[in-house]
């Protein structure tokens, strides 16, 4: 799935939206997404708390494998 950041308009590929991250000693629902690092331009994976991700990104394209 391709998502767009609400403020920057940058596009990212959603890798996994059903994972966990330990933040401040507490396990929270999280997502992993991939995009270009704004400093280096290299592709990086990012992790964000799911609720924060849902507030800052919108789906722009749902890419299905082998379609």
Identify the residue ranges that each predicted region occupies.
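Glycine-centered tight beta-turn/hairpin loop motif at sheet-sheet or coil-to-beta transitions
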Residues: 7-9, 41
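Residues that flank catalytic or metal-binding motifs in active/ligand-binding sites
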Residues: 10, 29, 53
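Basic/aromatic-rich interaction segments and small domains that mediate binding to polyanionic partners
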Residues: 18-50
């Amino acid at each position: 799935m391709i998502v767009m950041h609400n403020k920057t308009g940058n596009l990212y590929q959603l890798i996994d939206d059903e994972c966990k991250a330990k933040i401040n000693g507490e396990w929270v629902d999280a997502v992993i997404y991939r995009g270009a690092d704004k400093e280096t331009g290299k592709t990086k994976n990012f992790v964000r708390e799911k609720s924060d991700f849902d507030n800052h990104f919108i789906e722009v394209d749902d890419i299905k494998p082998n379609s």
